[in-house]
């Protein structure tokens, strides 16, 4: 039973199962899998879950970017404004502080994001919002 904000977008081929909540202007890209069949998944506003990610019962706060091919396991929390680097695996129960860059297997905090980093991430998110709008308007992208 997905609970999607009216401005959220899920790409064709992405799969949401169970108790998933997507916030305002959040987008989930191609072939991502959000498995909330055992634990709830909450993705905050203005967040971006990129292609081929796998999320289990976790919380992703507002304005986060979850890089391509990342995995986030049960009970992990990704703090507001954080970036999970492409291919990272966030272990079960990991608490990522706000404004963190996490990378690796298992994912570790690489650095705290500066205001400049956050501004760049917000600009990147804005570009994805544009792509999301194109995807919504293009009948070829509707599954």
Which stretches of residues belong to each language-model region?
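C-terminal segments of enzyme domains that contribute to small-molecule binding surfaces
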Residues: 3, 54, 60, 71, ...
């Amino acid at each position: 039973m997905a609970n999607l904000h009216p401005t959220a977008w899920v790409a064709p081929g992405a799969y949401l199962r169970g108790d998933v909540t997507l916030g305002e202007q959040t987008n989930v890209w191609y072939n991502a899998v959000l498995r909330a069949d055992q634990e709830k998944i909450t993705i905050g506003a203005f967040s971006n879950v990129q292609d081929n990610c796998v999320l289990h019962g976790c919380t992703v706060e507002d304005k986060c970017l979850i890089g391509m091919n990342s995995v986030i396991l049960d009970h992990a929390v990704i703090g507001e404004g954080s970036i999970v680097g492409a291919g990272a695996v966030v272990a079960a129960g990991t608490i990522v502080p706000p404004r963190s860059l996490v990378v690796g297997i298992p994912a570790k905090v690489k650095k705290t994001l500066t205001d400049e980093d956050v501004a760049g991430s917000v600009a990147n998110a804005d570009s994805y919002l544009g792509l999301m709008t194109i995807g919504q308007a293009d009948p070829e992208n509707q599954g």
